[in-house]
Amino acid sequence: VFNHKHMEAKERFKVVYSAGAKEFLQRITSKAREKIISNARKASYTIDPKLFKKLTGTDLWEFRTLYDGKQYRLLAFWDKTKEVDTLVIASHGFIKKTDKTPIKEIERASKIMKEYFELK
């Protein structure tokens, strides 16, 4: 017999939303926002590249949500300087029109990451 009660899920990392990510979440519909936050929470417990994956050739990761036919993305980076050495900072969000993540979004997230670590 398979017992679910003993399958305690362990959070693998904490998600912290930057001001830019929070602004993005405020601008979209509440249903889309709930779905994105729910997926980010889910990603912190599971390994699912449909929800959270590394952007090739960068130090950035993206939280991925498909909702109501739209591809929502929150770009993120790791901060391993804290005790929870797997803290993820979601830098900002955008809605993707194509399969590729736009270079300008990657550059923006890289700039936010650089500023974040300079302020530490």
Which ranges hold each PLM region?
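Basic, Lys/Arg-enriched alpha-helical interface segments
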Residues: 1-71, 80-88, 95-120
